[in-house]
Amino acid sequence: DKAERGFSFQLDSLLDMRMNQKQKLTAADIVNGYEYDDLVKLLYEYGEEKFAKKIVKAIIKYRQEKGKISRTIELADLINQAIPKFDSTKNPATKTFQALRIKVNEELEEIREILPAAFEILKMNGRLAVISFHSLEDRIIKNFFKEKLNTDRVSKKIPILHKNIQSAPIKIIKKMEKPSKDEISKNIRARSAKLRVMEKISEGR
């Protein structure tokens, strides 16, 4: 991690998180500018954080009493103090930082745009391999694969020849594969990775 980019809760930096430094919105803008309900919704939807309300209450209180939160360590410490202590391999700030990063960089929208574009330029019998690192990404990818797999459904009461029913334009090569224990031991960041692979077998839909 590069501390100056503000992605890490373990390295002190400005609360930035922009992958593209030319864009305006930063993580600090969100943390200091969003109202209570909007922040809670963000942490629930993009971080799947069950302690979202506790965290946001702590953020709002900090803003009212001490002012803006401008450093990554400030926010991480605040989160650590706000939620119940429990044994976990993940830092308590992980989900909040994930939610902020996703929002700042519009990561889910990027995935939704890239998948159909990648499929469109894929040659016949070409394969599309996609790795996700959290459930929100994987859900989008899984649904895209499922959409491509689903053939047009026609009622049995409609007189149509089977040959005229459009078949799925893909076949699944890897439904979902997780890293081995050996791989995780060499690269701890691989622990949440999921690989899905499809092959294009017709132009289809």
State where each predicted segment sits:
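S-adenosyl-L-methionine-dependent methyltransferase catalytic core, i.e., the SAM/SAH-binding region
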Residues: 1-205
